[in-house]
């Protein structure tokens, strides 16, 4: 097992980078994971992409729900490890897993039982699109427990300064997904052509393998996981502490997804092709925010451990070091999407009537990528401090602003592009406001 990285002693930039690089690579792999799905599904046509886009919103919603356990668990474990209390860290981790298992089972049951009314929310027009969306939802969200566990394992390994298991496990999952996608979607060799359903099955199989690999790495760990006893009675005090710390981030993520679903419903008013554009565009755009989110996770653990050790000077220096890496990446993504939207979008969808909408999406959202990277990294810094309210307040307020702004802008000649502008403008504002708020916070300390 890879030795954990010492985050509370030694050179700041090198230790932060050593922790962050595997996480960022893991995020890029996850992005590739999703993009490969989109490339293969895109070959079935924009209708298939629209099906996955609608059902995928509930997978996105599930990520907000698991944040309730993941955020509180990661911060408390990191803080306990930084303070030298690995026994406490083990209790927090056990409680985190218990909460996650409960949430995963309940969410899976809801998505399976109510799959049809959940898809009906989007007012899709094609019966085949609706049926495919229901099938995709029942499989991916019905078995969401594997996705939940993988996120918790990633957070806890990162909290103790060991980001390699997540990278290795996710890499194997990507390879499996690459192999299974064409086999199950198009029916190559002895496999039946399952189309959208095949993509869902390939995703779940890959996630199950990733979970098994995480269990193997956990069995080899001597820092945290041998202190975890899942069969012990739930610790209500620690569950309450995890809940209180994770709730603001959870609410922010759930509200964000709820708003995104409302926006998707507005987009659906322009046809199923517009839904496909939003789904593909969001996947392409993830080259920026998923990478930043990976680095933010490293910043979270770095700050949590140093906060537990009482080393405030390293916290400030660590945040500045993180920005030196994340902001150039955000700028690169801005240039990429604004200057080269056409060849990028054509990788996924080649239908001539859909491409202009895709180009518009990428160019408009491209302007916000730098600020989105700034927001995500700063949010990770706040959460590492145990202060989850500022990112939540900023995120919820400005995300809510997207709906009236989208309604106002779509009433102008911008039409569908007005929705894209509402997303881009609010992302820019979130980055600027949260950055200023964090500067004020650290000056007070």
Task: Put a short name on every predicted segment.
Residues 9, 13-32, 36, 58-65, ...:
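Residue-level signal for short hydrophobic patches within transmembrane helices
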Residues 18-37, 139, 173, 206-210, ...:
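Transmembrane helical elements of multi-pass membrane transporters/channels
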Residues 70, 140-158, 166-174, 199-214, ...:
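Short runs within selected transmembrane alpha-helices of multi-pass transporters and secretion channels
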Residues 28, 32-50, 119-127, 185-194, ...:
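Helix-terminus/linker motif at the lipid-water interface of multi-pass membrane proteins
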Residues 30, 34-37, 41, 63-70, ...:
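Alpha-helical transmembrane segments and their lipid-water interface positions
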Residues 1-20, 77-143, 191-247, 303-368, ...:
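Short alpha-helical transmembrane segments in multi-pass integral membrane proteins
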Residues 49-109, 147-166, 264, 277-335, ...:
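Small-residue-rich hydrophobic transmembrane alpha-helices
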Residues 41-60, 92, 127-132, 196-197, ...:
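Interfacial/gating helices of multi-pass transporter permease domains
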């Amino acid at each position: 097992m890879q030795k954990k990285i010492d985050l509370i002693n030694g050179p700041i930039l090198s230790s932060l980078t050593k922790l962050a690089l595997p996480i960022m690579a893991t995020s890029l792999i996850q992005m590739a994971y999703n993009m490969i799905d989109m490339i293969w599904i895109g070959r079935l046509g924009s209708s298939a992409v629209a099906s996955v886009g609608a059902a995928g919103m509930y997978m996105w919603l599930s990520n907000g729900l698991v944040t309730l356990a993941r955020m509180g668990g990661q911060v408390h474990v990191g803080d306990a490890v930084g303070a030298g209390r690995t026994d406490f860290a083990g209790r927090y981790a056990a409680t985190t897993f218990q909460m996650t298992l409960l949430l995963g089972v309940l969410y899976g049951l809801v998505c399976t039982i109510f799959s049809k009314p959940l898809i009906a929310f989007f007012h899709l027009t094609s019966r085949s699109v609706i049926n495919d969306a229901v099938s995709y939802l029942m499989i991916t969200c019905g078995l969401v427990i594997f996705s939940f566990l993988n996120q918790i394992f990633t957070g806890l390994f990162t909290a103790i300064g060991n980001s390699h298991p997540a990278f290795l496990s996710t890499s194997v999952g990507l390879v499996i997904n690459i192999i299974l996608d064409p086999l199950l979607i198009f029916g190559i060799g002895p496999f039946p052509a399952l189309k959208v359903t095949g993509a869902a099955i390939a995703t779940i199989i890959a996630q199950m393998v990733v979970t098994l690999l995480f269990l193997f790495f956990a069995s080899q760990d001597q820092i945290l996981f041998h202190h975890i006893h899942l069969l012990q009675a739930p610790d209500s005090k620690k569950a309450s502490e995890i809940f209180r710390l994770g709730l603001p981030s959870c609410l922010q993520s759930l509200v964000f997804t709820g708003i995104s679903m409302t926006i998707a419903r507005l987009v659906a008013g322009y046809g199923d092709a517009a839904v496909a554009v939003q789904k593909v565009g969001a996947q392409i755009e993830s080259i920026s925010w998923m990478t930043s989110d990976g680095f933010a996770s490293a910043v979270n653990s770095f700050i949590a451990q140093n906060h537990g050790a009482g080393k405030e000077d390293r916290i400030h220096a660590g945040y500045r070091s993180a920005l030196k890496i994340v902001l150039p990446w955000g700028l690169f993504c801005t240039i990429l999407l604004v200057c080269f939207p056409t060849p990028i979008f054509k990788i996924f969808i080649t239908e001539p009537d859909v491409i202009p909408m895709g180009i518009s999406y990428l160019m408009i959202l491209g302007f916000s990528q730098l600020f989105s990277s700034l927001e995500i990294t700063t949010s990770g810094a706040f959460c590492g401090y145990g202060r989850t309210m500022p990112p939540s307040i900023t995120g919820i307020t400005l995300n809510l602003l997207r709906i009236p702004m989208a309604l106002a802008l779509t009433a102008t000649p911008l039409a569908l592009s007005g929705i894209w502008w509402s997303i881009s403008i609010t992302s820019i504002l979130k980055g600027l406001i949260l950055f200023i708020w964090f500067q004020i916070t650290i000056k007070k300390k």
